[in-house]
């Protein structure tokens, strides 16, 4: 089946999915949970296009938003290279570019649906890369993620950005300020975008590191609010790893596929080194937070054990006090019982007429009291 026909079928299927509300189901769960980098649906951004000839900027196309116009410029100038920059494009606009430049329908679908894992795929002479940008978010413990897709072909590069990062205008200025790099062709665009993504990681990584150090101090200081923050930070770091770690694989695959261009390999190797350094720092933050989480759990366990020990000691003291009270109550009860019996003053009580009745009753009270005291003392109730 011709590629344009497959693209038409893809457009119809995506339209049906949007009507049924099932388009987002194909996105990975961990990415669907983080949509704060996305603007409201329907907020389509601008489309820009640049033409370069032998590493130097050329006059832009008359209508940068028309991929057919860009294609005609490339056909008219055999040495020209085009870079089309799309910001949250509509399905129709991306489909139009796909038809003009022969983009593979699977890559186009990924670019439309978005929420993809970082990767580098090759479809014939066209490559498709997914990169996840990251930067400091609104909160102290928050990282803001964006997504950019890069199509590269023999004489063109198309970037599709979902979110506000990376700053593609800064990438354009850098490329135009380095004619030797720009002369390497469309792959230079992929390298420059990836390098910008890696550079943008630095502030976010630094903020995560500061937050991790701060929460570590709070944990050892016994701050009860530290535990939820440790969990939040650890979640941010894990999401950061899922965005940054695959980028290293993307760059390494680019090194393997660009074996013939030594200059480009040099740039990709440098970017891969930076990506590896970022990955190591993020992994260090993750290990630190995991250790802090374990220490926090240990401290909480010790605190709970101490509370239980105090409760046990308190219960034991209460039990001892109850025993002492019960023992004294029993000791005092016997004399009280004897006194109560003989205090009833009935006429026919033989002991009342006995001369030794009074001293004997006192001795009986004292003897029972002493006996009970000795018994409770032996049983350690006193």
Describe the function of each predicted region.
Residues 194, 201, 278, 368-375:
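Alpha-helical transmembrane segments
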Residues 184-212:
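Well-ordered alpha/beta subsegment
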Residues 180-187, 217-221:
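Short, charge-rich amphipathic alpha-helices with coiled-coil/heptad character
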Residues 79, 89-92, 185, 189, ...:
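A generic structural signal for residues located within well-ordered alpha-helices
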Residues 2-180, 184:
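Divalent-cation
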Residues 155, 197, 205, 214-342:
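Membrane-associated alpha-helical segments
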Residues 331-382:
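Alpha-helical transmembrane anchor segments
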């Amino acid at each position: 089946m011709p590629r344009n026909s497959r693209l038409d079928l893809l457009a119809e299927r995506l339209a049906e999915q949007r009507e049924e509300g099932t388009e987002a189901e194909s996105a990975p769960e961990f990415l669907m949970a983080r949509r704060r980098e996305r603007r409201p649906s329907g907020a389509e951004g601008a489309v820009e296009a640049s033409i370069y000839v032998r590493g130097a900027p050329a006059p832009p196309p008359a209508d940068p938003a028309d991929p057919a116009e860009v294609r005609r410029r490339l056909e008219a100038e055999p040495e020209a290279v085009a870079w089309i920059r799309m910001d949250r494009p509509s399905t129709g606009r991306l489909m139009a570019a796909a038809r003009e430049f022969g983009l593979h329908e699977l890559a186009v679908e990924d670019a439309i649906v978005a929420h993809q894992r970082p990767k580098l795929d090759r479809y014939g002479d066209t490559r498709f890369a997914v990169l996840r940008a990251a930067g400091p978010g609104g909160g102290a413990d928050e990282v803001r993620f964006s997504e950019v897709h890069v199509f590269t072909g023999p004489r063109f590069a198309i970037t599709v950005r979902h979110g506000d990062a990376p700053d593609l205008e800064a990438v354009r200025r850098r490329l135009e300020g380095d004619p030797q790099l720009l002369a390497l062709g469309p792959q230079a665009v992929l390298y420059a975008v990836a390098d910008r993504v890696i550079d943008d990681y630095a502030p976010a990584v630094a903020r995560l590191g500061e937050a991790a150090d701060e929460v570590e101090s709070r944990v050892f200081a016994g701050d009860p609010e530290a535990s939820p923050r440790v969990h939040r930070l650890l979640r941010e770091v894990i999401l950061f790893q899922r965005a940054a770690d695959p980028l290293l694989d993307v760059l390494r695959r680019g090194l393997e596929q660009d074996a013939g261009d030594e200059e480009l390999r040099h740039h990709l190797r440098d970017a891969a080194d930076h990506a590896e350094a970022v990955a190591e720092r993020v992994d260090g933050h993750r290990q630190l937070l995991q250790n802090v989480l374990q220490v926090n759990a240990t401290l909480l366990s010790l605190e709970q054990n101490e509370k239980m020990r105090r409760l046990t000691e308190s219960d034991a003291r209460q039990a001892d006090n109850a025993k002492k009270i019960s023992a004294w109550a029993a000791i005092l009860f016997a004399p009280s019982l004897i006194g109560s019996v003989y205090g009833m003053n009935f006429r026919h009580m033989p002991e009342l007429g006995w001369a030794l009745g009074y001293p004997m009753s006192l001795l009986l009270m004292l003897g029972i009291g002493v006996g009970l005291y000795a018994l409770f003392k032996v049983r350690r109730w006193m």
